[in-house]
Amino acid sequence: MPSPPTPLTANNSPDKMSGVYGRTFWLAYLANSTLILGNALTFRFAELVNHLGGTESDTGIIVALGTAVAVLVRLSVSHVLDDYGTRRMWPLCAMLFVVGCASFLVPTDLSWVIYVARVAYFVGLTGMFACSMTHIQNHVPPERRTEIIGNLGSSGFVGMIVGSNIGDLVLRLVPDKRTQFVILFGGAAAIGLVYLVIVILLTRDQPHPRTASSPPAFRLLFRFWPGAVVLAAMIMGLGVTATQTFLTRFATSQHIDGIAAFFSGYAISAFVFRLLVSNWSRTIGRHWMLVRGLLGHVVGHALLAFATEWWHFIPASIVCGFGHALLFPAVVSLGSGAFPKECRGSGTAIILGFTDFGSLVFAPVLGWIIVHHGFTAMYLTSSGAALVTACAYAVVAWNHPDEEAARSTARTPDVNKHGTDRGYQPVEK
């Protein structure tokens, strides 16, 4: 059980709170909500592939290709984010997202165009998330990073609810398949343009003093290896693929009317739990947050495996939302915190890259399982993978107490000579 809320200290006093939750935070909050709204409209991507003549296995391969390119981009040019700053890189990623969403409307059959469009869309999307997380982390003290990442992430839940319900409404009211996808993916591109404007407003006065060029991502990764948290990041990628990519086809196969019930319940649950557990990183620590988040995915995906009615999505969504509320901020904070502050952009991109790598590894596997053994086997597989990872990471949590909680208790920062977070000490090589 978590310990009682941390008493009011210099680190969470009203003055400190007002400094953290100022104009920068709320503009970033609006931007992230807009991004998730646009992305939620693309949850019907598997339906688009099916409309173009593809199967779930084809969907898995397309998703894996887009993810593979995104991972390569992260690892090869992630240092550019530190060198040039979010003010330059963030708008570029947003424009790539817009181009990708618009390009989904070009092909009339399953051609190379859909592969290129998926690459552009996903590279842009992952870059936008990396810029957003890097930007907000650089505006708060180290001991508040997990809290601020979690609270910023809560902004996306409104967008997820609205976007998934719009998707269901479009499919229900618009009979023509082609028109459905024009509305969904064209709408995502238009929302991406709105996001671009918000990002420009958010970063236009942001200075970025040039320092020595950051080392390449591979060198940083070997020097400041984040540890076992990369396994949890990969399971996050598995969870994203199992729900955001394949749930729509699962609902269709089960003759369930839409996926809005799942994503609405998921978003509401994650938002509520994110508020309820916002101080857990400073009480039970991020390692145990991560274990509990993984267990949420274990139960949630197991429940999805046996869903036959729309309301069966609700209990699964609540448990999955709980898992996401804990897992995402803990993974990003632990992973990026292993890197020095001057390399925080690269560190954030790298740990999110392991999430993408999880999608890359598991998307074709899940697609193959669906084609040969069905959706029930696929969701039981994803649940089992999360369970194995949770058990393995529990050993880490038991043997490596999180020093973010220790710092909060001591009321003094505790960083090593590189300025990195010592919640799980990186390995220097």
Task: Describe each PLM feature range.
Residues 7-21, 203-231, 413-419, 423-424:
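Juxtamembrane intracellular "pre-TM" segments in multi-pass secondary transporters
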Residues 18-67, 229-232, 240-250:
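Helix-loop boundary and gating motifs at the non-cytosolic
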Residues 40, 67-75, 160-161, 267-275, ...:
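Residue-level signature of mid-helix packing/kink "hotspots" within the transmembrane helices
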Residues 73-85, 273-285, 370-371:
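Helix-to-loop junctions at the C-terminal end of transmembrane segments
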Residues 119-155:
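Cytoplasmic helix-loop-helix junction between adjacent transmembrane helices
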Residues 168, 189-209, 392-397:
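C-terminal membrane-cytosol helix-exit motif in multi-pass small-molecule transporters
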